[in-house]
């Protein structure tokens, strides 16, 4: 007769093993049958020793705690103090176990998010060679702070995300499909038609988030070149782009 093959899960710690046993026995964390869990817990530790696996002091401490709770539950209740001590010990264990379960769930979510970053691709930086006058007048940012621009960008991402299916991603995006130089010329053309325009007007025309970002960067580049200024006529109002008229 062949010996059964025993597979031992690689547990992250004593709480991980305890959660496994609770799930296996279909128990609730708040209604653990200590006598059943303790027996199985000790069997797992014994199996670890047989397989020459490293057993940390944390596993031993947890086993001792379970044995203590079990022994106190079997002994006659002579004093009320002992009963309180037993209940407190078990309560502390349950609270720690529930807290561990929460962190385990969060770590699994973060691991999933980390893996999903592999689906994100960035565009190479586009070098724009131009002579820039670094002496910008404050009037180019009339009633607008960097925080306002940051909020504008986040709002644009949110608005675009609500109108598009964010779960659908293009398999291939050409590096030269959205260029800052093209968007600069696009904004120049629009400002030649109207001297003042709302930046948000251009977002519905964008095909993807990358195009929104490139358009936003084109606006910043035009501000840097002193060709436009951005204005906010009221608190929390829309950010307007205004063409700068150069006096000849």
From Swiss-Prot:
Subcellular location(s): the record lists: Cytoplasm
Could you identify this protein by its name?
Answer: Segregation and condensation protein A
Q: What cellular component terms from Gene Ontology apply here?
A: cytoplasm
Q: Name one GO biological process term.
A: chromosome segregation
Encoding gene, per UniProt annotation:
scpA
Assembly and interactions? Component of a cohesin-like complex composed of ScpA, ScpB and the Smc homodimer, in which ScpA and ScpB bind to the head domain of Smc. The presence of the three proteins is required for the association of the complex with DNA.
What's in the keyword line of the UniProt record?
A: Cell cycle, Cell division, Chromosome partition, Cytoplasm
Tell me the disulfide pairings in this chain: none
Its principal location?
A: cytoplasm
What organism does the UniProt record list as the source?
Clostridium perfringens (strain 13 / Type A)
> What Pfam families does the record tag this protein with?
SMC_ScpA
Q: Which Gene3D superfamilies match?
A: 6.10.250.2410, Structural maintenance of chromosome 1. Chain E
What function does this protein fulfil?
A: Participates in chromosomal partition during cell division. May act via the formation of a condensin-like complex containing Smc and ScpB that pull DNA away from mid-cell into both cell halves.
Q: What family does the entry list?
A: Belongs to the ScpA family.
At the top level of its lineage, which domain of life is listed? Bacteria
Keyword hit for Secreted: no
């Amino acid at each position: 007769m062949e010996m059964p093959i025993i597979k031992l899960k690689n547990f992250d710690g004593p709480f991980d093993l305890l959660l496994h046993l609770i799930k296996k026995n279909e128990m609730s964390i708040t209604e653990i049958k200590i006598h059943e869990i303790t027996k199985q817990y000790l069997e797992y530790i014994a199996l670890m020793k047989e397989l020459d696996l490293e057993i940390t002091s944390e596993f031993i401490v947890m086993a001792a705690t379970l044995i203590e709770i079990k022994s106190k539950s079997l002994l006659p209740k002579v004093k009320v103090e002992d009963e309180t001590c037993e209940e407190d010990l078990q309560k502390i264990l349950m609270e720690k176990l529930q807290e561990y379960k929460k962190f385990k769930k969060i770590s699994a979510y973060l691991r999933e998010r980390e893996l999903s970053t592999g689906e994100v691709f960035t565009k190479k930086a586009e070098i724009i060679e131009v002579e820039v006058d670094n002496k910008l007048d404050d009037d180019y940012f009339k009633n607008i702070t960097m925080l306002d621009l940051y909020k504008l960008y986040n709002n644009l991402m949110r608005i675009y995300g609500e109108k598009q299916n964010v779960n659908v991603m293009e398999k291939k995006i050409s590096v030269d499909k959205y260029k800052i130089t093209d968007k600069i010329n696009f904004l120049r053309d629009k400002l030649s038609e109207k001297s003042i325009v709302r930046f948000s007007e251009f977002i519905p025309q964008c095909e993807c988030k990358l195009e929104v970002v490139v358009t936003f960067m084109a606006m910043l580049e035009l501000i840097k070149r002193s060709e436009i200024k951005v204005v906010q006529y009221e608190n929390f109002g829309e950010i307007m782009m205004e063409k700068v008229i150069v006096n000849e």
